[in-house]
């Protein structure tokens, strides 16, 4: 099956039937060729209804979950967005079609290098890709309107919430004792508001509880 057919099937059978109907959002997905961001050995997995795993901690979220994230936070053109977990640059590029400025951080050196190569190859100019441990973020001094964590965390992402502007939004999957759900965090003057949205699952991206390796 051709990649263009796979993409059409993804939009018409994964996104639209699940209430992803914002035409700007659909258009952002239509403009990006996922196969351009996959290593050769992963080409046959383009647009599948599942996560595409490069390694234990590096992956591309399944299209529906990423689309749900964007449908919830509603990116606007003037937003400066932080993406955590670049996944080779595919989700980064979808975001780049929706807002003026995207910062993407990646802690796996191989995937960071792949993302840099893919962003340059596809001539995307409104993206900055940074190599950083997700739990430290020492290189980031900016504050953001919105933050997208492309995977699951196992505790409230306090270090990332600190990077939000007041009234900013953070979206992620939070693993709790007996369930895993999409949560929306809204930054307030005194702390943050935490809203459970819906059940969802993905691999762990940020492990706040156990010691975590930083892959140079």
Predicted regions: what they are:
Residues 1-83, 90-94, 98, 111-125, ...:
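Class I SAM-dependent transferase core
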Residues 74-193:
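Conserved nucleotide-cofactor-binding alpha/beta core module
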Residues 216:
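Catalytic, metal-anchored helix/loop core of enzyme active sites in primary metabolism
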């Amino acid at each position: 099956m051709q990649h263009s057919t796979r993409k059409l099937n993804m939009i018409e059978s994964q996104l639209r039937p699940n209430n992803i109907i914002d035409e700007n959002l659909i258009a952002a997905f239509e403009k990006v060729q996922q196969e351009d961001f996959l290593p050769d050995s992963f080409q046959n997995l383009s647009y599948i209804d599942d996560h595409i795993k490069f390694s234990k901690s590096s992956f591309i979220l399944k299209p529906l979950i990423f689309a749900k994230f964007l449908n919830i936070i509603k990116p606007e053109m003037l937003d400066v967005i932080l993406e955590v977990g670049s996944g080779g640059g595919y989700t980064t590029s979808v975001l780049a079609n929706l807002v003026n400025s995207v910062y993407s951080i990646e802690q796996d050196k191989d995937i960071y290098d792949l993302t840099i190569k893919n962003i340059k190859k596809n001539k995307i100019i409104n993206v900055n890709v940074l190599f950083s441990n997700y739990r430290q973020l020492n290189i980031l001094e900016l504050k953001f309107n919105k933050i997208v964590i492309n995977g699951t965390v196992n505790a409230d992402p306090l270090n990332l919430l600190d990077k939000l502007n007041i009234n900013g939004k953070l979206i992620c999957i939070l693993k709790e004792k007996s369930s895993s759900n999409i949560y929306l965090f809204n930054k307030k003057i005194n702390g943050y508001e935490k809203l459970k949205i819906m059940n969802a699952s993905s691999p762990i991206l940020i492990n706040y509880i156990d010691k975590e390796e930083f892959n140079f």
